[in-house]
From Swiss-Prot:
Residues 128-352 are annotated as: Disordered. Signal peptide: none annotated. The lineage of its organism: Bacteria, Pseudomonadati, Pseudomonadota, Gammaproteobacteria, Pseudomonadales. This is Transcriptional regulatory protein AlgP. One of its GO terms (molecular function) is DNA binding. It comes from Pseudomonas aeruginosa (strain ATCC 15692 / DSM 22644 / CIP 104116 / JCM 14847 / LMG 12228 / 1C / PRS 101 / PAO1). The C-terminal domain binds to DNA. It is unknown whether binding is specific or non-specific. Keywords: Activator, Alginate biosynthesis, DNA-binding, Repeat, Transcription, Transcription regulation. InterPro entries: AlgP_N, Plasmodium_CSP_Invasion. The promoter for a critical alginate biosynthetic gene, AlgD, encoding GDP-mannose dehydrogenase, is activated only under conditions reminiscent of the cystic fibrosis lung (i.e. under high osmolarity), and at least two regulatory genes, AlgP and AlgQ, have been implicated in this activation process.
Length: 352
């Protein structure tokens, strides 16, 4: 069935077939015309030969009748000779016309074949177009296969850009946190607190350590617990021997006994950095101008905030030796600060 199936006819196929058949038919017609004219010329030549023979015979008869003295035979022979001569002249004219026709035909054949070369070029152009069309379906799948990886790489580049943007945002957020932490660390106004506040501001735990002074007790207790949970896995191995024995009992006693918090502060201070020291000094100075409830609330926030600061020795090993010798000095300064807090706390109660 596939062998008998005809190809789909397109204008290019039709043009190729018509141009091919036109050249073939033209060449065939020219050859046939030349053959026919040659046959006609040969036929006329035969007829002329026969007419000449008859004329020769008629002339011999006329001579014989003239010798015999037969007048009727002479007249009949003369009529036949005249007819044959007319026919012979006609044949000669036709032969001349046929020869002229053959000469013109040959000239026309040459001209038409020259013109038909343009038709042959059209046929060749149509054939090339059909061949290129047959070659295109073979190249298209290869071109599509080559285009798909290019599309994938183009699609991968936009996918890489959103991945780069989230990476840039976390880098920008710590910078914003440090900018927010530095103004909170500056009001301490102590030379010893500033060098310790800047390294502490670089980590994510510095923000909860600086902000609890301006917020209620519940918020500072919730934020450090959430943020130190991410910082503890890296900081626990180094911070356990220093921070846990001192900071955690102090935090527990601060949560259990609000009245005993000024006494629990010196226990939490030796493990904390100068950041915690300056933060503890600030609540000690503020209760003179605020009600009695706020001094009791702020010290409750500080030991809890000291826990993120206590985990920092894991990230800054060089600060540990500086922090441990200053523990007795911190204890003495905190002890001197707590009587001041007690006296300041007693003044508002008497005023109330």
């Amino acid at each position: 069935m596939s062998a008998n199936k005809k190809p789909v006819t397109t204008p290019l196929h039709l043009l190729q077939q018509l141009s091919h058949s036109l050249v073939e038919h033209l060449e065939g017609a020219c050859k046939q015309a030349l053959v026919d004219s040659e046959k006609l010329l040969a036929k006329l030549e035969k007829q002329r030969g026969k007419a000449q023979e008859k004329l020769h015979k008629a002339r011999t008869k006329l001579q014989d009748a003239a010798k015999a003295g037969k007048t009727k035979a002479q007249a009949k022979a003369r009529e036949t000779i005249s007819d044959l001569e007319e026919a012979l002249d006609t044949l000669k004219a036709r032969q001349a016309d046929t020869r002229t026709y053959i000469v013109g035909l040959k000239r026309d054949v040459q001209e038409s074949l020259k013109l038909a070369q343009g038709v042959g070029k059209v046929k060749e152009a149509a054939g090339k177009a059909l061949e290129s069309r047959k070659a295109k379906p073979a190249t298209k799948p290869a071109a599509k296969a080559a285009a798909k990886p290019a599309v994938k790489t183009v699609a991968a580049k936009p996918a890489a850009k959103p991945a780069a943007k989230p990476a840039a945002k976390p880098a920008a957020k710590p910078a914003a946190k440090t900018a927010a932490a530095k103004p909170a660390a500056k009001p301490t106004a102590k030379p010893a607190a500033k060098p310790a506040a800047k390294p502490a501001a670089k980590t994510a735990a510095a923000k909860p350590a600086a902000k609890p002074a301006a917020k209620p007790v519940a918020k500072p207790a919730a934020k450090p617990a959430a943020k130190t949970a991410a910082a503890k896995p890296a900081a626990k191995p180094a911070a356990k021997p220093v921070a846990k024995p001192t900071a955690k009992p102090a935090a527990k006693t601060a949560a259990a006994k609000p009245a005993a918090k000024p006494a629990a502060k010196p226990a939490a201070k030796p493990a904390a950095k100068p950041v915690a020291k300056s933060a503890a000094a600030k609540p000690a100075a503020k209760p003179a101008a605020k009600p009695a409830a706020k001094p009791a609330a702020k010290p409750a926030a500080k030991p809890v905030a000291a826990k993120p600061a206590a985990t920092k020795p894991a990230t800054a090993p060089a600060a540990k030796p500086a922090a441990t010798p200053s523990a007795p000095a911190a204890a003495s300064s905190a002890a001197s600060a707590t009587p001041a807090a007690g006296s300041n706390g007693a003044a508002p109660t008497s005023a109330s």
